[in-house]
């Protein structure tokens, strides 16, 4: 039991700079927890800071990467836990190797009709081991097929689709647009 302790670094920053000691601690944690294959090439990853970033503080990250979200969950309110889990996972994932996939495209010909399906198969999870993709980001895994194979149609659904206009801004997309245009600071976005 450590008593009262800070869990994250200064949060009012837009810097992506990470201290060397924090990168080393993350690399040690990743190697111990997942193995050497999960380390980013060279053992660490650096990201370019935007030209208008306030770089007085380093990036928002866990103070101690070994304090996993599950370790601190009993001491945090649900909202606090969710925020810490996100910060911890993003930080650890940022220092891990990329995920690798095998992309597949299948074209099915039936007389004049042609259907095409794209899928992927994960070869190596990399950073997705700590930060899985959301349901809307997951790819479809196609079954193994051979060229010339005859397929059986189980069902066919006819759908009519229409193009949709661009959606209105959400709070997140508005903040993202303001950041890209260099308008305001992260501390001012909270009031939006």
What would you call each of these model-derived segments?
Residues 2-192:
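Core catalytic DNA strand-manipulation module of type IA topoisomerases
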